């Protein structure tokens, strides 16, 4: 996969084997999906700066307060391990863009007034090269 490449869901599924945004196995983060809130507004992921090198990624859990579920625990554990994972951005049904490799750098569990619930927010940092 090349950063920026447009992929089908079948191609994304070679890496990200589930439909949920956080794919993990045995507590280790494998890959992430986003749509930057365009399709699923309950996941309001955003670029944190104009450079595009930092993303504020919303944790797992569509309704109600987000808790330390296995996907959110895997995101937290990735801060400690420091490993990089691929991020795929949904452009439209069946069209995904490979966004390169990202490292989970930080996390905060906070009340989001707009969503009226507790959310996990993870800071993703863009990695140079192929991850």
Which residue ranges define each predicted feature?
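Acidic, glycine-rich low-complexity segments with interspersed aromatic residues
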Residues: 1-96
């Amino acid at each position: 996969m090349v950063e920026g490449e447009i992929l089908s869901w079948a191609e994304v599924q070679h890496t990200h084997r589930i439909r949920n945004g956080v794919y993990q196995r045995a507590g280790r983060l494998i890959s992430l999906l986003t749509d930057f809130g365009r399709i699923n507004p309950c996941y309001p992921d955003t670029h944190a700066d104009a450079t595009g090198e930092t993303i504020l990624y919303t944790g797992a859990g569509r309704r109600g307060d987000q808790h330390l579920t296995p996907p959110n625990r895997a995101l937290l554990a990735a801060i400690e391990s420091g490993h990089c994972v691929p991020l795929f951005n949904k452009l439209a049904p069946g069209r995904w863009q490979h966004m390169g490799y990202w490292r989970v750098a930080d996390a905060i569990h906070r009340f989001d007034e707009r969503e009226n619930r507790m959310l996990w927010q993870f800071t993703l940092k863009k990695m140079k090269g192929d991850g």
